[in-house]
Amino acid sequence: MLEIEHKPEFLKKIEKIKDRGLKEKIKKHVTKIIEFPEVGKPMMYSRKGTRELYIQPFRLSYAYLKSENKIVFLDLYHKDEQ
């Protein structure tokens, strides 16, 4: 079974979002990631080993550790804050 972990920063940023529609969209994408962990775009260079999924206007960053059968949700940030 797939193990799910959330970083505290990730949860804080989701709590700050006031828009219900956006929260629902994020929830759907998190479910999608859990079902298909390799759905996100693989990152390169300093972010190697992580993946990102674009949820307008945010990017959801996560790590899929295939050997450990684990997903770690790392961050949710505005696309202009890269």
What are these regions (language model features)?
Residues 1-5, 16, 20-24, 54-59, ...:
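Enriched for short, Lys/Arg-rich terminal
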Residues 6-10:
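Basic, amphipathic "hinge/linker" alpha-helix immediately C-terminal to the N-terminal HTH DNA-binding motif
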Residues 12, 24, 41:
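Alpha-helical elements of the RecA-like P-loop NTPase motor core of helicases
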Residues 30-54:
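A short, surface-exposed loop/turn module that caps and links secondary-structure elements
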